[in-house]
Amino acid sequence: MNSITLGPLSKANGEIQIPGSKSLSNRILLLATLAKGTTKITNLLDSDDIRRMLESLTKLGVSYSLEDNGTTCVLEGLGGPIQADFGDLFLGNAGTAMRPLTAALCLGKGEFLLHGEPRMHERPIGDLVDALQALGVDITYEGEKNYPPLRIKANGLSGGEVSIKGNISSQFLTAILMSAPLAKSDLTIKVDGELVSKPYIDITLHAMKQFGVEVENQNYQAFVVKGQQTYQSPGEIMVEGDASSASYFLAAAAIAGGKIKVHGVGTDSVQGDVKFADVLAQMGAKITYGPSWIEAERNELNGIDMDMNHIPDAAMTIATTALFAKGPTTIRNIYNWRVKETDRLYAMATELKKLGADVIEGKDFITVTPVANLKHAAIDTYNDHRIAMCFSLVAFSDTPVTINDPGCTSKTFPTYFELFNTIAN
């Protein structure tokens, strides 16, 4: 296994243009597929998860061309459901492709097999399958119940009313929302229990609106969608920068001294993870916002105790930022870390302890208490892009850090370590 060693580094300075949002890229690709008309998508993320979606669309007969090193996609919409008769789709570990495609493929008439990497077959999908079965879909598990691989025999999606659990992943609700306008009749989706990661549902609703479909949102407890609609291509659409990816650079400035301006996200962003900068500000960092940029500057950081369910991915960056704060930091209501690319609560706690930090790992929280001197450690990344990027920040201590398998960042940010080197002094 290859590794890289970073630091020790003293300052972080510069300006960064972050790549397109993973969450938005895969949502927009699917909506453009179902829409009437040709869509030109710019600032598309060029990464493994997006390639898995594009490869699947190719197998399903969707026509598109890529330009600008894969960051511009011109896609011919189908003006309705996917018409393929059969598809054997390998989706890697891309939840943003697996979940929405599972629902969208139910709209047509074919037979489809959806599978992925071993970790994908450990990530639950039962709540989504239960909801689709309640809407009349013939969908079965090829392996263990509640987990992929899945086999779908599609015959359209009936309307009516369906309940879906909201406490594991908002992607299950996103999947049904995006397919609901093409259902045979109006659909009311009721959320059973607390809905995690509400900002990701806002991303979905915003993207649907860009393609001409409005959803009645009843305080995130129910959603009403008219059936037998057709998405309309907006012609050209730009994917905003990935707010989770911005978090590492903003945190670097807050930790290290210097000033970093991140372009691609700001006050105009639809992503909830831009609120990460507010958390940094509460810890003491100097933060300035523009419509499409955020700037961070160092100040003395203090530990915080906070519910971070609204920024689950970016909250991981707070766990390593906590190493540089005064006093303990507790990140709460993050059970869904456990069903991501790896069990992130376990992974973060394990690797932080290697550095010498005092860590408490709860069922749905983590407490990190910093120590005066961090240990040099080799950080295992669990094939999880965000673990690798989070722990790069340790390089701004007095101790170098070794990151094992740094190539795992190809899932969402293949050029991360190149850009990291441009801001590091």
UniProtKB/Swiss-Prot annotation:
The active site is at D313. GO terms for cellular component: cytoplasm. Keywords: Amino-acid biosynthesis, Aromatic amino acid biosynthesis, Cytoplasm, Transferase. It is found in: Cytoplasm. Its EC number is 2.5.1.19. It catalyses: 3-phosphoshikimate + phosphoenolpyruvate = 5-O-(1-carboxyvinyl)-3-phosphoshikimate + phosphate. It is an enzyme of class 2 (transferase). GO terms for biological process: amino acid biosynthetic process; aromatic amino acid family biosynthetic process; chorismate biosynthetic process. Phosphoenolpyruvate binds at K22, G95, R123, Q171, R344, R386, K411. InterPro entries: Enolpyruvate_Tfrase_dom, Enolpyruvate_Tfrase_sf, EPSP_synthase, EPSP_synthase_CS, RNA3'P_cycl/enolpyr_Trfase_a/b. One of its GO terms (molecular function) is 3-phosphoshikimate 1-carboxyvinyltransferase activity. Belongs to the EPSP synthase family. Catalyzes the transfer of the enolpyruvyl moiety of phosphoenolpyruvate (PEP) to the 5-hydroxyl of shikimate-3-phosphate (S3P) to produce enolpyruvyl shikimate-3-phosphate and inorganic phosphate. This is 3-phosphoshikimate 1-carboxyvinyltransferase. It comes from Marinomonas sp. (strain MWYL1). The gene is aroA.
